[in-house]
């Protein structure tokens, strides 16, 4: 059975005032709790990238670790984590970025990717784009052939794609737009 994108959107839980007052949080975990929704989401994302020659799916901690390995398996690719500092055991590279309330940093293993890799960089949600932009910069330091960027949800009103306007070589797509 094919579920519409509208049904997927309706199944996303909205949590007001989380993590701070005034924020409406879109909880994508409701898409994962039922096998039909999870399969539909997996199928849609697979169809988006099945002909792109993806060799590595890179997921951003932590919700990028849910669909990332599923996509990697479906695409016949490896999975690479991007994590917060101090969580990866071997030699890493890092990229820092500004957030609305301070700075943050993401890291990847130095040997995670190479110039032959076609990368699908995945996270659950595009809001302001800061985390993904830092992750994309980090991945590009390892010189892959091509970088695709994917989100389950894009919050259109926050214009997160705008931080990528100078990255003409990066293909950015989302499954659902809110």
Swiss-Prot record:
Organism domain of life: Bacteria
Catalytic activity field: AMP + diphosphate = 5-phospho-alpha-D-ribose 1-diphosphate + adenine
Transmembrane parts of this sequence: none
Pathways involved: Purine metabolism; AMP biosynthesis via salvage pathway; AMP from adenine: step 1/1
GO BP annotation list: adenine salvage; AMP salvage; purine ribonucleoside salvage
A Pfam cross-reference name: Pribosyltran
Compartment(s) of residence: Cytoplasm
UniProt-recorded Gene Ontology molecular function terms: adenine binding; adenine phosphoribosyltransferase activity; AMP binding
Family assignment from sequence similarity: Belongs to the purine/pyrimidine phosphoribosyltransferase family.
HAMAP family reported in the protein's UniProt record: Aden_phosphoribosyltr
Record's protein name: Adenine phosphoribosyltransferase
